[in-house]
Amino acid sequence: MRNSARVSVAMAVYNGEKYLHQQLDSILVQLKGKDEVVISDDGSTDSTLAIIQTFMEKDPRIRLIRGPGAGIKQNIANAIAHTAGDFIFLADQDDVWMSGKVRRVLEIFREKHCHLVVHDCIVTGAELSEIIYPSYFDYRGYGAGMVRNIWKNKYIGCCMAFHKSLVPYILPIPDDIQMHDQWIGFLNDKHRGGSVFLKEPLLYYRRHDECVSDFGTNTVPVMIKNRLLFLCRQFSR
């Protein structure tokens, strides 16, 4: 599969100067010449754009596009929409990919004949040596299916890769849903069959004060409302 498959990395960024360099280094070393990193910047005001431009001067596999200025979900959707690869890997601006992540995930696509893979990760603080959870799956749980994931979502975008055939189902991502990764996971299970959860950590998932996304909690009434709205949007696809 790797000889013919093209990998696209879809990354949404916003004011990511602190960790972006390390993340891009960890990604690019794993990619082949025909692969690409599509970065959608949502109006960064720090040195994020300068960092990306420096990388682009040395590496033509990086493409920078202007984000829609409509928040993280639509910024991610914008990056996905501009990808050209056979397999799309989602990437946050502040994590670090472990060596062999791309190779291992592509192996799973080949072995399982699936359309979406979610792998485990190690949750850290701002410093990667600060281990918060040695296994996100052990902390959160894991497994495919609507019943298992509607209340407590186990799909985690930064650990997700999917086949390009899912894109017409995924896009556009509704503005009023809460989680883009849950949206993608459910649509795969609905239209392409069960997602594969790989209990191998292939990423350092960094949690810090500047995180764009978080583990945030809502009140039960808000959660119920969000889930009902989410299901309505799902059934429309």
Functional labels for PLM-detected ranges:
Residues D41-A50:
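A conserved acidic beta->alpha catalytic loop
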Residues G67-T83:
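Glycine-rich, basic loop-to-helix element that forms the pyrophosphate-binding segment
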